Amino acid sequence: MKTVFIFLITGFEEIEALGIIDVLRRGGVNVKSVSLTDSKQVVGSHQISVTADLMFGEIDFTQAEMLILPGGTTKFKEHDDMKKEVLAFANKGEKVAA
């Protein structure tokens, strides 16, 4: 089953990430949150700790339907492996939201 992956990194905007996850799951979409830190526990911009479903290394990008990067921080640009995968995904014409 195709999956929507939403990336979480320290300082992410909680409402942008959790609101999207909630709406997609209510709609029956397979969505997984992905930690870009060294732990599944990720702290957002308002000090709310969230437990991600997966670590970045666990993703099978061939199963991705869409990639989402919530706002709140510029730290996403520091994660080189994620940037590489997102660019490759976008260059294939796949859906990326930020």
What are these regions (language model features)?
Residues 1-96:
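Extended, subdomain-level signal for the structured scaffold at the beginning of enzyme domains
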